[in-house]
Amino acid sequence: LADLILGCRQLEALVRDAVAEFDRLDASHRDGVPMAFTISMNSLKITASRLVIEIVSQALILCGMAGYAQRTPLSLGRQLRDAFSAAVMINNTRILADNARMLSISSGMI
């Protein structure tokens, strides 16, 4: 349970930091977002999508068979499928490749 709570707090901190980073953007950047910010947000998406899978998987293990079974109040099948959708729908591999391209272009901007 402690690992599950820690994972939730890590995810919350990641999102809170990203919101703060967005808020710090100068108004002049609203039309053209700096590449470093784009890389940072892409990295947030990748990290968050991996972390949510880990969190739901840990919850499933805590619930045991009741979480694994389809028709119980503790069933986590839908949540696990939704957690994986974050990595699948907007593919993390493609985002990593985009980040690599931007980093190779920017070299030293971050």
Model segments located where?
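Glycine-rich phosphate/cofactor-binding loops in nucleotide/flavin-utilizing enzymes
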Residues: A66-I110
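Extended amphipathic alpha-helical segments enriched in small hydrophobics
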Residues: L1-L25
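Charged/polar positions within long, soluble alpha-helices
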Residues: A13-R16, A20, I53-I61, S85-V88, ...
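Alpha-helical structural motif
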Residues: G7, L14, L44, I55, ...
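Charged, glycine-rich active-site and insertion segments that engage polyanionic ligands
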Residues: V33-Y68
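Surface-exposed loop-to-helix/strand elements on domain peripheries
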Residues: L1-D3, A27-T38
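Short, polar/charged, Gly/Pro-enriched helix-capping and turn/loop motifs at alpha-helix termini
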Residues: A18, L25, L62, A66-A69, ...
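Generic structural signal for well-ordered, non-transmembrane alpha-helical segments
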Residues: A2-R9, N42, I46-I53, R81, ...
